[in-house]
Amino acid sequence: MEESQGYLELYKSRQHDFLYPLIFQEYIYVLAHDHGLNRSILLENLGSDNKFSSLIVKRLITRMYQQNRLIISANDSNRNPSLGHNKDLYSQIISEGFAVIVEIPFPLRLVSSLERKEIVKSHNLRSIHSVFPFLEDKFLHLNYVSDILIPHPIHLEILVQTLRYWVKDASSLHLLRFFLYEYRNWNSLINPKKSIFVFSKRNQRLFLFLYNSHVYEYESVFVFLRTQSSHLRSTSSGALLERIYFYGKIKHLVEVFANDFQAILWLFKDTFVHYVRYQGKSILASKGTPLLMNKWKYYLVNFWQCNFYVWSQPVRIYINQLSNHSLYFLGYISSVGLNPSVVRNQMLENSFIIDNAIKKFDIIVPIIPLIGSLAKAKFCNVLGHPISKPARADSSDSDIIDRFVRICKNLSHYHSGSSKKKSLYRIKYILRLSCARTLARKHKSPVRAFLKRLGSELLEEFLTEEEQVLSLIVPASSTSRRLYRGRIWYLDIICINDLANHE
């Protein structure tokens, strides 16, 4: 009966965007626990039945509103040791709960919009690899690219204000605002100027949600301006935009430029503008001129400062020519180069030599940062020489091999779109030899003798699925190597590999 009541509350919240009752539902915090919350925090009695309980959450929220909310009494500490030693108890529990709760309306609204417009959902669009075919298709026809460092908001309150356009529940927003205000006071004693950065590190899930919601709001200007300039409505992006207060922001923008908005709109009539965001950076590419790119730069700076109260400077936006610049993001180095080709043309008695230069989009694996990640994880030294992993020497042989093979296959899977596989082969060699050194250290035998005794079994373990399939269907002396050099994009990768993330 209690479970049915919980689902009933969730259904009501879906209908009315009323999230406050969900704060006191136990299954919300069980779900938050599954995303990394420490298990001992949400235990009502550590010595009895170990049940998750929202009673602690209710007490914590009540204590937040009390005058002595920042003081945890000695009696509470004695009754429940898990409440006494953790200074960030309020932050950890409530932020994890909020992170789950405030995310509820967004996928529901998106799904309902897609169903209403009869748009077929595609989970493959979530894949990181889906970005690269887009870049490969579009960037060949563009001239300039801007590397943008996205500014952070100067106050946490700005992040809450963004949610007002989506969440209509004033009680939840008030509690979230009060929580962020108290969190800033708690950390102001230590570092008053960097409270938002401290919050982002200790409450990553909630901060990333608030930050992405905020960035998403001022990113929508690209779709809006493009729609206004081309006079075409995009049905695919209509479900993703909330334009309730945008025209009010335009009026404010008019005061800044002291000009009519339609008079400056011609600056942005560029149908070849493409925008990609990744982590804290973004890319704005265009077929226009350097003058147009500079106008975009100063427009973005003024737009961020005047409408979203984030401080930015033009020097945070770097404009480069695509033919002379490499893009480094998502674990790849991407560049647009020229692939020369010579064609001999025969016309009657005359022959001509025609030189053609075809643009080619190259995507390669950055070997030096990747070796740095492997060295930091103790797979090799800073020069790329494989070393043993002493921490894994106590495990069984099968566990050691499985761990190294899993890391190798994950990296190969993620970097399968590389144009040049030589760097990837070196990474595989480092992991394979590091695995052999770890096993040899465990068995106290020389590496060469251990590899000789093991034979080709260890090498076969490190073969990826693509290599295994090609070895079966294509003879080794044929074009298998040429086939494997081709780029392969997977549409099931939804997060950046930890070793591939060098940011």
UniProtKB/Swiss-Prot annotation:
| One Pfam family hit | Intron_maturas2
Q: So which domain of life are we looking at?
A: Eukaryota
**Swiss-Prot/TrEMBL keywords:** Chloroplast, mRNA processing, Plastid, RNA-binding, tRNA processing
GO terms under biological process? mRNA processing; RNA splicing; tRNA processing
Range of residues in the leader sequence: none
| Main subcellular location of this protein, as a coarse class | plastid
The molecular function terms of the Gene Ontology recorded here are: RNA binding
Per the entry, what this protein does is: Usually encoded in the trnK tRNA gene intron. Probably assists in splicing its own and other chloroplast group II introns.
The record ties this protein, via PANTHER family, to: MATURASE K
Q: What is this protein called?
A: Maturase K
Q: Which organism is it from?
A: Liquidambar styraciflua
